[in-house]
Design a protein with these regions (language model features):
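Short coil-to-beta transitions that initiate beta-strands within beta-rich domains
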Residues: 22-42, 68-86, 111-130, 154-173, ...
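Short glycine/acidic-enriched loop and turn motifs that connect beta-strands
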Residues: 53-55, 97-99, 141-143, 184-186, ...
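Short loop/turn segments immediately following beta-strands, especially the blade-tip
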Residues: 106-107, 148-150, 189-195, 280, ...
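Short, glycine-anchored, charge-dense loop/turn motifs used at functional sites
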Residues: 712-723, 750
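Glycine-centered coil/turn sites that cap beta-strands in beta-rich domains
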Residues: 10, 14-15, 682-714, 732-735
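Blade-level signature of beta-propeller repeat domains, shared across WD40, Kelch, NHL, RCC1
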Residues: 649-680
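Short, surface-exposed loop/turn motifs with a glycine/proline- and acidic-biased composition
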Residues: 69, 728-760
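Conserved beta-propeller blade signature
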Residues: 45-48, 89-92, 133-136, 176-179, ...
Length: 771
């Protein structure tokens, strides 16, 4: 393998970013910092890794800082942390075999294994140091690195003609290397001249076959952990180079990690911690560090002091002091889960649910949601309310913040109905027993809510699959109404998305039938006789005959944008939808001097309209696109290679139009981006310039927000000389901070003169430049 170097700085900072304004064109993450899978202990710090980010605890001042892809990490999907004490280096391994080496805030990325074409899994399972070399236990074998420069010395492939062995962990004892694999233990002399030839390795006959997941050297013995998938249990064995035996002195449940230091061995279980001496006698135990129901220990490490560190999936980074039996918990504010299926934003608040209704089957994702309210995350674990609901909630797949009351959030469950959550009251579960939601006629006892949304009057609309009346509406006074979509949807159909447009029309998708139905109760929900309903023709006038509708959006011109499994379609005359058949059409764009339908080769997952009527479009594999108002021009394409975006799988997009921040929900977490358009105002009472003052080292965009729609702006100096001019995008002007000649203005005060489209309303704002 040929070594490549990429150096850059990793920036550490505390998570106070939610209260800080985000400059245009920059990102910030919204990740869980209480959900950790791997821990590494350094002399001055402790590191805890989640799926996408790392929390750093400073031992001296007890401060917390974070690293993610935004701050310089090269990848996402962290699998393992390891601190190489001999080189004062933190090693970060990713699930795709990418590697980062961090020393004194300088990062070296080594993508060699990631980029190599290799048979078998590339996952790096563990690390082992021996004689100035670092050995990586991988899915395909062992990679040997020189710890002086992290160059690859050699690679040992652990495969025979008929089988590939995954190496889970490696150690050395009595001048022999031992490896634990998914099918037994193997060994070879450390000076074996043909060590890269797996046929020269010998199986440890006494260990037999089986999946060995851990291997440690302890007090002259080998300690091996074996997992039996047939019963889902682990066993520990000891080998003293003569005898192989089961360690019956140690009892354990759900064994998660083993650590060895000196004459002590640490055992970490899901909710219990134990320390044993060289005779395997128990010398210290913690039966619970918080509450067994809410504990999920994943990794644990000795500190060399009286402290033990635990990475917990629920409680963050846990420190246990053995001398005083004291427990401390370290975490930062954030959502509960990396999974983000749907999000909603209102007035600077953000709600997210992790469940889904993919393929319209239950996945039994844990029922919870997270809510960023007044710049603080709140988490609702519905298992805490089981005594109220008498049901274990799962698959919360849709969420909506009440536009009339930001303290109130609703979430729909694919199987259990609708949850009403208030920040200062217990939640309420709605099902057929206390609402007009209906049980499925196909799946006994289940209530399938696929999507929810509020109309302009504060009424909540939702889809209800597999029943006679697939649309329900709840008023603020808790009066319920349900609606039939006959004759277009009859019987037990899946109804998924619902959009309430500016005309109060309801657009409803039936994905398995490839139907889009438009419906109006005509303002009289209790009188079905005046209801109107029609079917939309999706394919007759379209260039691409699609089979599945995935999402809906209304733009500022009232046009209906439709996301499908093969690109985007638009209904240009939706005002006629209830009086005549309307047709969906593709958008034709120019590509390499030819014509092509907009994103016709992409599965569209989300469409959101910004304050300038541009469209943010999410896809399942290609990231996110910013498209011009009419859809004919690609303005920006964000993906995991050209941006900090965590994943190319975009599940949802929502915009906080008060500041132009765009939130992307992905399968690996939420990330936001400050766009160039924000909500237009009706006057100039709330104009704000950011940043202000503009410091000498600032190179980013200067934004003037709070403007009236499409304001014309002129920037002049104190003498009245024109420096630059332009139009606002929605209610926001974006300026690169340079004059017409590309030069940064001199130190001084500059004035932004703004006027609306009529020229009747005007405003003046000031900017201070420091050069």
């Amino acid at each position: 393998m040929k070594k490549k170097y990429i150096f850059f700085f990793v920036i550490s900072f505390s998570l106070v970013r939610l209260s800080a304004q985000l400059p245009v064109g920059t990102f910030r993450e919204h990740l869980p910092y209480d959900n950790f899978k791997s821990v590494a202990v350094a002399p001055d710090a402790v590191y805890a890794a989640g799926e996408t980010s790392i929390l750093r605890f400073n031992k001296q001042d007890k401060s917390l800082s974070t690293w993610s892809k935004i701050d310089g990490l090269s990848d996402v999907g962290i699998s393992k942390l390891y601190y190489l004490n001999e080189k004062n280096t933190l090693i970060i391994a990713y699930q795709n075999a990418n590697l980062d080496f961090v020393k004194e805030n300088q990062l070296l990325n080594m993508p060699d294994i990631k980029n190599k074409q290799i048979i078998g899994s590339k996952t790096i399972n563990n690390f082992f140091v021996y004689d100035n070399y670092l050995y990586l236990s991988c899915g395909f074998g062992v990679v040997v690195l020189n710890t002086d420069n992290f160059l690859v010395k050699e690679t040992w492939f652990t495969r025979t003609a008929n089988k590939n062995y995954e190496v889970k962990e490696m150690t050395a004892s009595r001048n022999k290397f031992f490896i634990a694999t998914d099918d037994g233990l193997f060994f070879t002399p450390t000076n074996n001249p043909n060590i890269a030839d797996f046929s020269t390795w010998e199986p440890l006959i006494e260990a037999g076959n089986g999946n060995y997941t851990a291997l440690k050297y302890f007090n002259g013995n080998l300690i091996a952990q074996k997992y039996d998938s047939s019963v889902g249990t682990d066993s520990l064995f000891v080998y003293n180079h003569n005898d192989w035996r089961y360690i019956d002195e140690i009892s354990y449940e759900e064994l998660r990690a083993i650590d060895v230091r000196g004459a002590e061995m640490l055992i970490c279980e899901k909710y219990r911690l134990k320390v044993h001496d060289t005779q395997f006698q128990l010398i210290y135990t913690v039966n619970s560090w918080y509450n067994r129901y809410y504990e999920n220990g994943q990794d644990a490490k000795f500190d060399g002091t009286d402290d033990i560190w635990i990475g917990d999936r629920v409680n963050g980074l846990v420190k246990i002091n053995r001398r005083f039996n004291k427990k401390e918990f370290y975490f930062l504010d954030g959502p509960h889960s990396y999974l983000a299926h749907q999000i909603d934003s209102r007035n600077g608040n953000l709600a997210v649910v992790p469940g889904s209704n993919v393929n319209y089957q239950k996945s039994y994702t844990q029922g919870n949601f997270s809510y960023l309210y007044n710049k603080k995350w709140g988490i609702c674990l519905f298992s805490a309310y089981d005594n109220l609901f008498a049901v274990q909630l799962s698959d919360l797949c849709c969420v909506a913040i009440n536009p009339k009351n930001s303290q109130e959030v609703f979430a729909g469950s694919w199987g259990q109905g609708l949850v009403q959550y208030n920040t200062d009251a217990p939640p309420t579960l709605y099902n057929p027993e206390n609402s007009l939601l209906q049980y499925s006629t196909v799946h006994e006892g289940l209530v399938f809510v696929g999507d929810i949304t509020f109309d302009n009057n504060g009424r909540l609309w939702m889809t209800n699959s597999f029943c006679a009346n697939p649309i329900c509406m709840r008023q603020a006074d808790n009066r319920w109404f349900s609606f039939s979509l006959n004759p277009y949807l009859v019987g037990s159909n899946v109804v998924d998305k619902i959009l309430v447009d500016s005309r109060n029309y309801k657009w409803v998708t039936a994905p398995q039938l490839n139907k889009l139905v438009v419906f109006s109760e005509n303002g009289t929900p209790s009188n079905p006789s005046d209801d109107k309903i029609r079917n939309v023709d999706l394919n007759t006038l379209a260039n691409v005959k699609t089979s599945t509708i995935t999402c809906l959006a209304e733009d500022l011109d009232g046009e209906i944008w439709i996301g499908t499994n093969q690109g985007v379609k638009v209904i240009y005359n939706p005002q006629n939808a209830l009086s005549e058949t309307v047709f969906a059409k593709n958008i034709i764009i120019e590509v390499n001097s030819g014509a092509q339908n907009l994103l016709e080769f992409e599965n569209i997952t989300a469409i959101t309209v910004d304050a300038a009527n541009r469209k943010w479009i999410g896809t399942s594999k290609a990231g996110a696109f910013l498209i011009s108002a009419n859809g004919t021009e690609e303005l920006l394409h964000l993906n995991e290679k050209n941006s900090p975006l965590f994943s190319n799988q975009i599940n949802d997009i929502i915009i906080d139009n008060t500041n132009g921040e765009i939130f992307f929900a992905t399968d690996k977490g939420i990330i936001s981006y400050r766009g160039t358009a924000s909500e237009a105002k009706e006057d100039y009472n709330d104009v704000m310039v950011f940043p202000n003052p503009v410091r000498e080292n600032y190179q980013g965009t200067i934004s003037v927000s709070g403007l009236m729609y499409h304001s014309f702006c002129k920037i002049v100096d104190a003498a009245g000389n024109l420096v630059w001019q332009g139009f606002a995008e929605g209610g926001q002007l974006n300026w690169n901070g340079k004059d017409f000649y590309g030069k940064k203005p001199a130190t001084g005060v500059y004035y932004v003169f703004s006027s609306d489209e009529t020229g009747k309303q005007r405003n003046v704002a000031k900017i201070l430049f420091i050069k």
